[in-house]
């Protein structure tokens, strides 16, 4: 049924469909009786899925990745829709419109997306107002990025401005230095630039702080970020963001070229995201929390990430192509995998398949 609906929706511009679908999700979870009904249908409440990660209780390991709920307007929707947590944003200190449309593109042949949104959002103050009004529910992380007009030299102060507003209201913070759609942002992943930025954010909040990295980093740079995270006492690393690479796609080259710049998400990034996760786990073991995102569509893929060292996993493009029952399918499947493997909980499986 959803496959047929997807074909109809794909006749409309991607960003318009996003707004319509997101509005529908917020509507059906706004009122208590309907919210409870949706939750009974979509939530998998199974004790083997629970995990305590950086001191927070996660009812299930699959969360919504940043990029869908940019302004935290849907924070009360994600739990009833079956997710174990959600990451809102990316939020910047100042409101900004992002890049000109069209800026979101589908690659159905690859079940992928290309976006060059450019951190369009209404600013950290606006997101803080929404977070302040949220109901008790699943953990919510705030993903913060650099305001486009702010110079790189002033990035620590810019990130800190967002952290001051969102830190008291979110359950954890994610510092995004890996989007390809803000000029110069990925340069902040270099350790000499990243150290003062992360230190400034850490000094301004009391909640756990993680950093989100790109799949396009070299292996040496992945190691360097991991070492820095340990040095500074970060809670963890989110790996990975979208990729600027375009190799191995089923979509014709001329169509991809016509789309132009942007970050590619979905199955084409899965292999590299898994490689980065494995490298990080080999480097840091259980000293940092690893959240794996990038190309996860199936139960087997989510389970593979957990065995490779991910305490939590995330999806966005998988949700778009998988539909409203996607999170439920993943969680039902993971609960089955946990029991079949003889573990008492998903926490016991984290890193169990990693090469020692």
Curated annotation (Swiss-Prot):
It catalyses: (S)-dihydroorotate + a quinone = orotate + a quinol. FMN binds at residues 66-70, 90, 143, 176, 212, 240, 266, 295, 316-317. GO terms for biological process: 'de novo' pyrimidine nucleobase biosynthetic process; 'de novo' UMP biosynthetic process. Coiled coil: none annotated. Its EC number is 1.3.5.2. CDD domains: DHOD_2_like. It comes from Rhodococcus opacus (strain B4). Its main location: membrane. GO terms for molecular function: dihydroorotate dehydrogenase (quinone) activity. Belongs to the dihydroorotate dehydrogenase family. Type 2 subfamily. Its cofactor is FMN. Catalyzes the conversion of dihydroorotate to orotate with quinone as electron acceptor. Substrate binds at residues 70, 115-119, 176, 181, 241-242. GO terms for cellular component: cytoplasm; plasma membrane. It is an enzyme of class 1 (oxidoreductase). It is found in: Cell membrane. Keywords: Cell membrane, Flavoprotein, FMN, Membrane, Oxidoreductase, Pyrimidine biosynthesis. NCBIfam families: PRK05286.1-2, PRK05286.2-1, PRK05286.2-5, pyrD_sub2. It is a peripheral membrane protein. Monomer. This is Dihydroorotate dehydrogenase (quinone). The active site is at 179 (nucleophile). Pathway: Pyrimidine metabolism; UMP biosynthesis via de novo pathway; orotate from (S)-dihydroorotate (quinone route): step 1/1.
